[in-house]
UniProtKB/Swiss-Prot annotation:
Residues 673-693 form a coiled coil. CDD domains: GBP. Its EC number is 3.6.5.-. This is Protein SEY1 homolog.
Length: 883
C-alpha cells in the first residue's frame, strides 16, 4: 500500500504516463473538488530534495544511498500525497481545531544540473520548471547555503525562467493567485548568518535583480515581485551533523505550511477529478509548442488563455445545445427544422464568437484565430447531433412518402388477379419512353382495361421509381439546406454532414423499392402462371378424344409456343422492370443487375432448365459491385441537385438496350419456357393422379355411345357384339398410357419431359383401378341385356298393379295412417315426385334404371312378405274351428 502512495507521472524520456487518473481514484483523491493543494520542489541534483519531502510530508520518494556513490536517483517527475491525518489545525491560527486539512499533492522533480543528461539537460529542466509552475500552489526551491552567490548551483537561471513565465501566464488575470516561492536553505547555521540576512540576500540579489532585468508588459512595469509571488525563506540545519535540529526545523516548516502558507483551496481552480487530464494537457502543450527547446512565453500564454476562454464559451453554450438536443431527440417536427437555422446562427454561433473575441483578441492573432476555429468546430460537433436528428426525421418522412406513393401507384396491379388476355400487338414496341406514353389513341385504348393499365405500369416501374427517388432527394436537400449555418464574422457558410442520413434514406428507398418490386413481380408471375394454367386446363379433356400420341403432343407444343410468344410480346418489358436486383440495389445501374454479362454482352446459362436459377444467382454475385456503382450514380444525382442542374433519367435507355439485346431476350424466353413447363409438369402430375378416372371416361365415351354419339340400347345388342364393343373400348381407353408416356420426339418439351416420365407404380395403380370399374360397367350392360324388357316398368301389365293394390290395401292404409300421424308422408311424397321428375327430364336413365330395380325388389319382397302373413293368418283361423 505504501508503494501505491507514489507514482511516476513523467518518465525519464519526457513521456506522460497515462495511469495518473486511476492512481488518484485508488487513493481517493479524485473526488476532492477544489479542496486540495499542490507543492512542487526544484533544485540541483543530489541536493536532498526527496529527503526533505519525505520528512516534511511523510512521503516515500526514493533517496540516494551515499554509500554507493553519488548518482541520479529521481528520474522524471513523481507524485505523492499527504492527508495530514495526524496533524490538526492550530487553534491559534484557524480558530477551530477540528477543521479538516486539505490533502496536499507533492511533486518531486528530477534535479537540475544533471551530469547524466549532459548538454541536453536544459530542455527537460525548463519543461519541468514550467510544468511545476503551472501546477503548484507552492514552489519549493531547494539550495545549499554555501551555494549562495553561485549561478548554477543557486538555480539563478531557473529562477529567471520561472519568473518570466509566471508573469506572462498570469499577467492578464487580475484575480490570479500568487505563487508561493519557498526557499529552503540547506546546511544553514545560525552562526553563519541569521535567516533574515539570508532572505534579504535571496530577495535583493536574486529575485529583485531578475525582476529588474525582465522585459515586462506596460501593465506590469510599475508592479513589483510581491504582486506575483509570496516569498518565504526557511533555513534547515544539516541533516546529518545536526539531525535532531534538522527534524525540528522540518516539523516547524510542516506546521507553518498547515497553518500559514497553505491556501484554503487549490489556487489553479482545477477540480481534482480533472487534475490528471489537466496535467496531461499542460505537459503536451509545453512539449509540442516548444521552439529551440524553450517554449515561447507569448505563444504559451496565448495558447493557455485562448484554450481557457474557448472552454468557458463552450461550457456556457452547451446547456442550451443540450436542451435543443433533448427536444430534437424526443419529438422532432418540421417546425423545429425550420427554426434550427435561426437560433443556431444567432444564439449559438454569433453569440459564442462575440464572447470569445472580447478576451481572446488581445493575444497572438494566429493562435487566437486558430482557437476560434477549434471553438466553431466544437460547437458544430454538438450541433451536428441535432442536425442528424432533424435529417433522420426528414428521411423517415420522405422514405414513408416514397413507399406510400409507389405502393399506391401499383395497388391496382396487386388487386387484379385475373388471367391475361394477350393481344397480338407486341408490348416491346409500346411505351418506348418508359412512361407508358404513345399516341393518344393507344393510351386511351390501354386505359380501357385493368390488364393494360397494369402492363403499362409494370413496363415503366423502374422509370417511375427513379423519378420518385429523384423527387425524394430534392425534398431531402431542401430540408438539409435549412440546417446550414452562415458565419457572418468569417463570411462563409458551414455545411453539416448529411451523408449518414442520406445513406439511411438510400437504404430505406432501396428496401422499399425492392419490396414493392418483388411484390409486383410475384403478382406478375402468379398471373402469368394462372394464364398458362388456364391454357392447359383442357388437356385432360383432350386426352379423352385424342387417338394417338402425335396428335396430343403436337397440340401441346402449339400451346407452349403460343404461350411463349404471347408472354414475350406482351410481358417482356414488365419482366425486365420487375425482375432482378438484390438487397441494397436501387433503380440506378439496372442493366448491370438484370443479367450476367461478359465483355461481348452475352449470357452464361448452363441449360434452359437452369435459366431461372442462373438469373437469381447473378443477383447475389454482383450485389457488392452494384451497391458501389449505384451509390456513385445516386451521388451523381445529389451533385446535380446541389448544383441545381437538370436531371435526365437513363433508366429507359438501359431498358431499351436490354430489349434490343438478342441474347437478353433469348434468355428471357428460356425463363418463360421454364415457367410454362413447370405449369405443364404440374398439370401432367395432376393427370397422372387421376389416370384411372380419365381411362374410365375414355372407355365410357366409346362403350356407352355409338359413332353418332347416341346412347347404346343394350337390350337390342347381342352378346357377341357387346363383347366386341367392350374390347374396342378397352383398347381405346388404355391407349392413353402410350400417349402420356410420350414415346416420341417433341421439340422443346423433350428438354423438360423425358420419355416414360410417369412412374410405373402410378400407371399400374391407375390401370388396376380402371379395370375394376370397366368390368363393373360391362356387367351392368350385360345385366340390362339379359333382363331385357322384364326390367322395364312399361312392360308391367295393368292387372298386376290392380292385384297389387287390392292385396296390399290394408298395409297401404296402415303406412298411410302411420306417416300422416307423423306429418311426414306429404313432404316425402313431394320430395320423391321432385326427384323423379328431375331425373326424368334430365335424361338420367342410369339413375332411373337403378330406381326401377329398387322398386321391383321392394315390390317382390313386399308380395312375398304379404303371402307369408296371409298363410299364418289362415292357420290361426283354423285352430278355433278344430277345437
Amino acid at each position: 500500500m505504501q508503494m501505491d502512495r507514489k507514482t511516476q507521472i513523467i518518465d525519464y524520456d519526457g513521456n506522460m504516463i497515462a495511469d495518473l487518473k486511476e492512481w488518484m481514484i485508488r487513493n481517493k483523491l479524485a473526488n476532492l473538488g477544489f479542496n486540495y493543494n499542490v507543492v512542487a520542489i526544484l533544485g540541483s541534483q543530489s541536493s536532498g530534495k526527496s529527503t526533505l519531502l519525505n520528512n516534511l510530508f511523510k512521503t516515500s520518494f526514493d533517496v540516494m544511498n551515499t554509500k554507493l556513490g553519488h548518482s541520479q536517483t529521481t528520474q522524471g517527475l513523481w507524485l505523492s500525497f499527504d492527508t495530514f491525518e495526524e496533524s490538526p489545525v492550530s487553534p491559534l491560527e484557524k480558530g477551530n481545531s477540528t477543521t479538516p486539512i486539505n490533502p496536499t499533492l507533492i511533486l518531486d522533480v528530477e534535479g537540475n544540473d544533471s551530469k547524466e543528461r549532459g548538454d541536453n539537460r536544459l530542455t527537460f529542466e525548463h519543461r519541468s520548471a514550467l510544468f511545476s509552475l503551472a501546477l503548484a500552489d507552492c514552489l519549493i526551491v531547494n539550495l545549499w547555503y554555501h551555494s549562495l552567490g553561485n549561478f548554477t548551483a543557486s538555480n539563478y537561471g531557473l529562477l529567471k525562467t520561472v519568473m518570466e513565465v509566471n508573469l506572462e501566464l498570469f499577467q492578464q488575470d487580475k484575480n490570479c493567485p500568487k505563487t508561493i516561492l519557498l526557499f529552503t536553505v540547506r546546511d544553514w547555521f545560525e552562526e553563519f548568518a541569521s535567516i533574515d540576512i539570508v532572505k534579504n540576500k535571496i530577495v535583493e540579489e536574486y529575485l529583485n535583480k531578475i525582476w529588474a532585468e525582465m522585459k515586462k508588459p506596460p501593465s506590469a512595469k510599475k508592479a513589483n515581485i510581491n504582486n506575483y509571488f509570496i516569498v518565504e525563506v526557511v533555513g534547515l540545519s544539516h541533516a546529518i551533523i545536526k539531525k535532531t535540529e534538522f527534524l525540528n526545523d522540518v516539523e516547524n516548516l510542516r506546521k507553518k505550511w498547515i497553518n500559514e502558507l497553505r491556501p484554503l483551496q487549490y489556487s489553479r481552480n482545477i477540480p481534482s477529478d480533472g487534475f490528471a487530464h489537466y496535467c496531461n494537457n499542460i505537459w503536451n502543450t509545453i512539449v509540442k509548442q516548444s521552439q529551440l527547446d524553450i517554449p515561447s512565453q507569448k505563444e504559451m500564454l496565448a495558447t493557455f488563455r485562448c484554450q481557457e476562454i474557448k472552454n468557458n464559451v463552450i461550457s456556457n453554450t452547451s446547456k442550451m445545445i443540450k436542451e435543443k438536443l433533448t427536444a430534437s431527440s424526443s419529438q422532432p417536427t418540421s417546425a423545429s427544422i425550420d427554426e434550427f437555422k435561426s437560433w443556431a446562427e444567432k444564439d449559438i454561433v454569433e453569440k459564442s464568437l462575440d464572447e470569445y473575441f472580447v478576451d481572446a483578441s488581445r493575444y497572438t492573432e494566429s493562435i487566437c484565430l486558430k482557437t476560434s476555429e477549434e471553438l466553431l468546430e466544437s460547437l458544430f460537433i454538438q450541433l451536428q447531433t441535432i442536425v442528424d436528428n432533424n435529417l433522420n426525421f426528414t428521411q423517415r418522412v420522405l422514405s414513408a412518402k416514397f413507399a406510400n406513393e409507389l405502393n399506391t401507384m401499383y395497388s391496382v396491379c396487386t388487386s387484379d388477379k385475373n388471367v391475361f388476355l394477350f393481344s397480338k400487338e407486341s408490348n416491346l414496341q409500346v411505351h418506348k419512353d418508359g412512361n407508358g406514353s404513345n399516341s393518344s389513341k393507344e393510351d386511351k385504348k390501354d386505359e380501357n382495361t385493368s390488364q393494360d393499365k397494369c402492363i403499362r405500369l409494370w413496363s415503366s416501374f423502374l422509370s417511375n421509381a427513379d423519378k420518385l427517388e429523384y423527387i425524394t432527394f430534392c425534398n431531402f436537400f431542401e430540408s438539409y439546406q435549412k440546417c446550414n449555418i452562415e458565419i457572418r464574422k468569417k463570411n462563409k457558410i458551414h455545411e453539416f454532414n448529411y451523408k449518414p442520413s442520406l445513406n439511411i434514406l438510400l437504404t430505406s428507398i432501396c428496401k422499399d423499392m425492392n419490396r414493392i418490386r418483388n411484390t409486383q413481380f410475384t403478382v406478375l408471375l402468379e398471373r402469368t402462371r394462372a394464364t398458362i394454367k388456364s391454357r392447359f386446363k383442357n388437356m385432360d379433356n383432350l386426352l379423352i378424344t385424342t387417338k394417338n400420341p402425335e396428335e396430343y403432343w403436337n397440340h401441346t407444343l402449339k400451346i407452349v409456343k403460343a404461350l411463349q410468344e404471347s408472354i414475350n410480346n406482351n410481358l417482356t418489358k414488365c419482366f425486365i422492370n420487375l425482375k432482378g436486383g438484390g438487397p441494397g440495389s436501387s433503380v440506378a445501374g439496372i442493366s448491370n443487375e438484370l443479367f450476367d454479362h461478359d465483355e461481348d454482352n452475352t449470357f452464361h446459362v448452363d441449360s434452359p432448365s437452369e435459366g431461372h436459377r442462373s438469373i437469381s444467382d447473378n443477383r447475389t454475385a454482383h450485389e457488392n459491385k452494384h451497391y458501389v456503382d449505384e451509390n456513385l450514380l445516386n451521388y451523381k444525382k445529389i451533385d446535380i441537385i446541389k448544383n441545381k442542374g437538370k436531371y435526365i433519367s437513363s433508366v429507359s435507355e438501359e431498358i431499351d438496350k436490354q430489349i434490343k439485346n438478342k441474347k437478353a431476350i433469348s434468355e428471357l424466353n428460356n425463363y418463360y419456357l421454364d415457367e410454362i413447363m413447370d405449369v405443364l409438369k404440374s398439370k401432367l402430375d395432376e393427370i397422372s393422379d387421376n389416370l384411372s378416372s380419365i381411362i374410365i371416361q375414355r372407355f365410357e365415351s366409346v362403350f356407352n355411345y355409338d359413332d353418332a354419339e347416341q346412347p347404346r340400347h343394350w337390350r337390342e345388342i347381342s352378346m357377341a357384339e357387346l363383347k366386341k364393343i367392350f374390347r374396342e373400348s378397352k383398347n381405346y381407353a388404355f391407349l392413353i398410357i402410350d400417349i402420356l408416356q410420350k414415346n416420341i420426339k417433341v421439340e422443346l418439351i423433350d428438354d423438360y419431359l423425358p420419355n416414360n416420365f410417369i412412374k410405373d407404380e402410378v400407371i399400374e395403380k391407375g390401370k388396376n383401378k380402371a379395370k375394376r370399374k370397366i368390368q363393373e360397367i360391362c356387367r351392368d350392360a350385360q345385366y340390362i341385356q339379359e333382363t331385357g324388357g322384364k326390367m322395364s316398368l312399361k312392360n308391367v301389365p295393368l292387372f298386376f298393379w290392380v292385384i297389387l293394390l287390392i292385396l296390399g290395401w290394408n298395409e297401404l292404409l296402415f303406412f298411410i295412417r302411420f306417416f300422416f300421424r307423423l306429418n311426414i308422408i306429404l313432404p316425402l311424397f313431394l320430395a320423391a315426385a321432385v326427384i323423379l321428375s328431375t331425373l326424368f327430364f334430365n335424361g338420367n336413365m342410369e339413375v332411373l334404371s337403378t330406381i326401377n330395380k329398387v322398386v321391383f325388389f321392394l315390390a317382390k319382397s313386399s308380395f312375398g312378405f304379404y303371402r307369408q302373413l296371409q298363410t299364418m293368418g289362415e292357420k290361426v283361423a283354423q285352430v278355433p274351428t278344430a277345437d
